[in-house]
Amino acid sequence: MLWNLLALHQIGQRTISTASHRHFKNKVPEKQKLFQEDDGIPLYLKGGIADALLHRATMILTVGGTAYAIYQLAVASFPNKGVTSIIPAITWFTFIQLSMDQKSDK
């Protein structure tokens, strides 16, 4: 039993140590030159299309999340004024609030 485990351990070491090593080109100096150029392009757009899409998605999510948080604060501030009818949105908070209001009316 112990010999089997020892043989298995040696096979595992042999396959790892004899694997071919892939050498990748170091792209850091190229990227440094690209990002340090003073060409008037904003830094967040120098990375190409992927960086531009990532920046736009981040901005949309940030602005949308901020607007949603402000909306939820308004809903929580005026529970009896009917702010939820101005901007229709079904949330867990308003669902619980409405179900509690229906129970208290009975």
Curated annotation (Swiss-Prot):
InterPro entries (UniProt xref): COX7a, Cyt_c_oxidase_su7a_sf, Cytc_oxidase_su7a_met
Superkingdom assignment: Eukaryota
A GO biological process held by the record: mitochondrial respirasome assembly
FT transit peptide: 1-23
Localization of this protein: Mitochondrion inner membrane
Coiled coil: none
A Pfam family matched in the record: COX7a
Signal peptide: none
Family: Belongs to the cytochrome c oxidase VIIa family.
Protein name: Putative cytochrome c oxidase subunit 7A3, mitochondrial
Species per Swiss-Prot/TrEMBL record: Homo sapiens (Human)
Gene giving rise to this polypeptide: COX7A2P2
